[in-house]
Swiss-Prot record:
Organism field: Arabidopsis thaliana (Mouse-ear cress)
Keywords for the protein's UniProt record, in alphabetical order: Chloroplast, Membrane, Plastid, Stress response, Thylakoid, Transmembrane, Transmembrane helix
UniProt function note: Interacts with photosystem II (PSII) core complexes and participates in the maintenance of normal PSII activity under photoinhibitory stress. May protect against photodamage or stabilize PSII under high-light stress. Participates in the maintainance of proper PSII function under high-light stress by protecting PSII from photooxidative damage.
An annotated GO cellular component: thylakoid
Phenotype upon gene inactivation: Altered photosystem II (PSII) function under high-irradiance light. Elevated photodamage to PSII reaction center proteins after high-light treatment.
Protein name: Protein MAINTENANCE OF PSII UNDER HIGH LIGHT 1
């Protein structure tokens, strides 16, 4: 069996004899033949500086969009032969990493779409035609509604001339008669203050009664005094 040394870019095949015998042997007459086979490097898998994407770090590349001449219909993310897609990022060691996060592009097969992947302006003609058709239908519907409303509009009634009496005649006719009440004379009553003032001059009569009391008492005392001497004389 032969010993095999693996390298990142190729394979190294030693001589048919074991490698240990070559190291331990002291004879210098033997010759060793080494054959180096380098593996083919794919451009899409290389990580060298010349193959690194020339993209701005921290942004998402937009090369996953459909090309102008793409003829594939449906969900298909077209890409160029050496296109770099995804999120470009550099790590702390300075190595550029590309993450494949591109979304799938869907080409709708409808009347608005052009039916093929490409720029968004390809289906603008169909979109404009559909919008114009919808606008014409809306205008026709609005005009028909206005015509129907104009036909069904009610006619205005004709004015009739009035030949009867005026309104003031009926107002005076049905106006109720006014009720006249006779005026009653107002009775004036003397205020009580005047009665008090008229009763004040009568108060001197009380003083006259008081002055008459001593006179009556004196007149009563005189007959008693006159009666006493008469009794003594008779005795």
């Amino acid at each position: 069996m032969s010993n095999v040394l693996l390298s990142p870019n190729g394979y190294v095949f030693a001589s048919p004899k074991p490698l240990g015998r070559f190291i331990n042997s002291k004879s210098g007459g033997r010759k060793l033949f080494f054959s180096v086979v380098r593996a083919s490097s794919d451009d899409a898998d290389c990580n060298a500086e010349e193959c690194a994407p020339e993209k701005e770090v921290g942004t998402v590349s937009m090369e996953w969009l459909a090309g102008e001449k793409t003829k594939v219909v449906g969900t298909f993310p077209p890409r160029k032969p050496r296109g770099w897609t995804g999120y470009v990022e550099k790590d702390t060691a300075g190595q550029t990493n590309v993450y494949s996060i591109e979304p799938a592009v869907y080409v709708a097969e409808s009347a608005i779409s052009s039916g093929t992947a490409g720029s968004s302006a390809d289906g603008a003609e169909n979109t404009a035609a559909i919008v114009a058709g919808i606008a014409l239908i809306a205008v026709a519907a609005a005009s028909s509604i206005l015509l129907q409303v104009g036909k069904d509009a009610p006619t205005r009634p004709k004015a009739v001339d009035y030949s009867g009496p005026s309104l003031s005649y009926y107002i005076n006719k049905f106006k109720p008669s006014e009720i006249v009440q006779p005026s009653t004379p107002s009775v004036t009553e003397a205020p009580p203050v005047a009665e008090l003032e008229t009763s004040l001059p009568e108060t001197p009569s009380v003083a006259q009664q008081e002055t008459s009391l001593p006179e009556t008492m004196a007149s009563e005392a005189q007959p008693e005094a006159s009666s006493v001497p008469t009794t003594s004389s008779t005795s």
